């Protein structure tokens, strides 16, 4: 391998290392977003299950740390269906929709975690090679 070939290979490794780092950053941001959505969906599912539990006084979070106390006798909730559409669904169907979304986002989160792991492993391999070559 000529010096020129070695330089080109080193440059390619450096570029790959930078690209892998950018991809890792993007995947980690997506992972954080999916984790937040899962938390929100789980909270909503808990709320629907509480409503299914029967009448009684409840505290409902209305944002910014504020809660309102009330008695809810509703049998339906306005549920997002996707693509900006909402529908009033009975509590059982709302629970089913939320559970399906939780499963979908859980699979996505697992996939992101696997990809993050693979990219982190590749980044470490490249870093070790560059380190052995005295670069970085």
Swiss-Prot record:
Cite the InterPro entries for this sequence: PFD_alpha_archaea, Prefoldin, Prefoldin_subunit_alpha
| GO process annotations (BP) | protein folding
- Gene3D superfamilies under this entry? 1.10.287.370
List the CDD domains hit by this protein, alphabetically. Prefoldin_alpha_GimC
* Molecular functions (GO terms): unfolded protein binding
Pfam families noted in UniProt: Prefoldin
Q: What is its main location?
A: cytoplasm
Give the record's GO CC terms.
cytoplasm; prefoldin complex
Q: List the disulfide bonds.
A: none
Keywords, comma-separated and alphabetical: Chaperone, Cytoplasm
Q: Where in the cell is it found?
A: Cytoplasm
Regarding protein family, the annotation reads:
Belongs to the prefoldin subunit alpha family.
Name the job this protein performs: Molecular chaperone capable of stabilizing a range of proteins. Seems to fulfill an ATP-independent, HSP70-like function in archaeal de novo protein folding.
Q: How does it assemble?
A: Heterohexamer of two alpha and four beta subunits.
Query: Any idea what this protein is called?
Result: Prefoldin subunit alpha
What organism is the protein native to?
A: Pyrobaculum arsenaticum (strain DSM 13514 / JCM 11321 / PZ6)
């Amino acid at each position: 391998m000529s010096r020129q070939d070695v330089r080109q290979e080193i440059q390619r490794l450096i570029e790959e290392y930078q690209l892998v780092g950018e991809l890792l950053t993007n995947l980690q941001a997506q992972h954080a977003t999916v984790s937040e959505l899962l938390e929100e969906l789980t909270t909503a599912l808990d709320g629907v299950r509480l409503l299914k539990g029967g009448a009684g006084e409840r505290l409902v979070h209305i944002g910014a740390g504020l809660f309102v106390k009330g008695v809810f006798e509703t049998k339906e909730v306005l549920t997002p269906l996707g693509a900006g559409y909402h529908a009033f669904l009975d509590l059982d169907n709302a629970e089913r929709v939320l559970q399906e979304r939780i499963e979908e986002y859980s699979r996505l989160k697992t996939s992101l975690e696997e990809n993050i792991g693979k990219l982190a492993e590749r980044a470490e391999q490249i870093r070790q090679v560059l380190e052995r070559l005295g670069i970085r």
